[in-house]
Structure formats: structure tokens, C-alpha cells
A protein has these predicted regions:
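Conserved NAD(P)+-binding/catalytic subdomain of aldehyde/semialdehyde dehydrogenases
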Residues: 1-41
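Flexible, glycine/charged-enriched surface loops at secondary-structure junctions
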Residues: 3, 40-45, 65-75, 105-106, ...
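General beta-strand structural signal in soluble alpha/beta enzymes
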Residues: 4-6, 15, 26, 83-84, ...
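Gly/Ser/Thr-rich active-site loops/lids in small-molecule metabolic enzymes
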Residues: 6-12, 38-45, 49-57, 67, ...
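Electropositive phosphate-/nucleotide-binding environments in soluble metabolic enzymes
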Residues: 7, 20-28, 45, 49-53, ...
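A glycine- and small/hydrophobic-rich beta-loop-beta segment
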Residues: 36, 44-119
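C-terminal core of ALDH-fold dehydrogenases
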Residues: 95-209
């Protein structure tokens, strides 16, 4: 058996958009995720009622043209087109959802991106579709789903590297951090932890650091 960090899937995309977004692009982004599987989820969060309505119409138009229409149609049953009152609310909802893929199609997408703390992979601007991340832009598309982006990152080289830490404390260093270690150990009532430092500090005070 091989341990893994988490199950990946079902797949998700969220488009975070304002009134400047192109509904044709947004609909295409939602459908590109919906065709993955019947349990995929595609979410639009927008501050614009007009955009929401335009995207709804465009999704129906593009859906009718897809070879995987039946799959995408079932996926859309799990999906939502959400209108919020402000961009601040949209960002708060996004961070709570922690989408696997997040596409930001707003006028000030860079400043919006700075406020995103939970997402697997973020696609910036109207010309950056999620499918670019799947195939060509170089980012890994094995990403946390189902809210796990709050705690995990996507697969990277770090995922396959085993790391060992090494530390050495010199006399000056022990004199600096030793009292803090003693205080913390005493607070946890771990006297042996404290003593491991205290005996060394005592030796240093007596001029014997060995």
C-alpha cells in the first residue's frame, strides 16, 4: 500500500467575475469543468445580475453544441450561478469555498487575487482559461478539491522530496534561547525538557561547555 495525502476529485471550478467579464468566456470556463464528469461542480460568483443572466443564456447555447452534453448537463445540476452584493462578499465566499480551480475575471483581477487565501490554482484575467493549466501553462493540475485547498497545496516537486532538518546550537545561542526553552517547558510541566537545557546552561556558567 502507498499512502496519499488526500483523494483528488470530484473536480471544481469557480469563476469570480464582475460586470466587465465576457459572458461567452465565463460560460466556456464553466462548461470546460462540467464536461469532466457528472459529479463535477462549476460555480459563478459575480457582483453583476446582468452578467449572471447573460452567462445562463450562453451556457445553454454552448451546452447544446458539446459532444459530452449529457455529462455536462448532469454536472450543471450540481452547479450554481451566484450573485452577491459586493466584491468583498464574493471574496469571502470564495475563500470559504476554497475551489480547486479559481478563475478571476474582473477589471482589477490582480488586487482581487491578493485577497485570495484558499484556492488550489488561480487563473488571472479573461484570457487565462482553466484548461491552460491542465495542458500547457506549466502549473500542476493535481489539486486539492472538496475544500481541502484550505489546508493543502497542489502536487509539486516538494511532494516527492523527503526532508531532514539539522541544527547545532553554539554557547552564545544557548544563552540566548535557553531561558525561553526553560520557560516554555515549565509552562507545559515538562521538567525533563527544561532540565536538558538547564544542565547545559549550568555547565556554561561554570566555564565548561562540553
Amino acid at each position: 500500500d502507498v499512502a496519499i495525502d488526500m483523494p483528488a476529485g470530484p473536480s471544481e471550478v469557480e469563476v469570480l467575475a464582475d460586470e466587465t467579464a465576457n459572458p461567452i468566456f465565463v460560460a466556456a470556463d464553466l462548461l470546460s469543468q462540467a464536461e469532466h464528469g457528472v459529479d463535477s461542480q462549476a460555480i459563478l460568483i459575480t457582483t453583476s445580475v446582468e452578467l449572471q443572466q447573460a452567462v445562463k443564456v450562453e451556457v445553454e447555447r454552448q451546452l447544446a453544441l458539446l459532444p459530452r452534453k449529457e455529462i455536462a448537463e448532469k454536472s450543471l445540476a450540481n452547479s450554481k450561478l451566484i450573485v452577491v452584493d459586493s466584491m468583498a462578499e464574493a471574496i469571502e465566499l470564495t475563500n470559504a469555498y476554497a475551489p480547486e480551480h479559481l478563475i478571476i475575471e474582473t477589471e482589477d483581477y490582480l488586487s482581487v487575487a491578493e485577497r485570495i487565501v484558499n484556492a488550489g490554482s488561480v487563473f488571472l484575467g479573461s484570457l487565462t482559461p482553466e484548461s491552460a493549466g491542465d495542458y500547457a501553462s506549466g502549473t500542476n493540475h493535481t489539486l486539492p478539491t472538496n475544500g481541502y485547498a484550505k489546508a493543502y497545496s497542489g502536487v509539486s516537486l516538494d511532494s516527492f522530496i523527503r526532508k531532514i532538518t539539522f541544527q547545532e546550537i553554539k554557547p552564545e545561542g544557548l544563552n540566548i534561547i535557553g531561558p525561553a526553552i526553560e520557560l516554555m517547558a515549565a509552562n507545559e510541566q515538562l521538567d525533563a525538557h527544561k532540565n536538558a537545557v538547564s544542565v547545559r546552561l549550568g555547565q556554561l556558567e561554570n566555564g565548561n561547555g562540553n
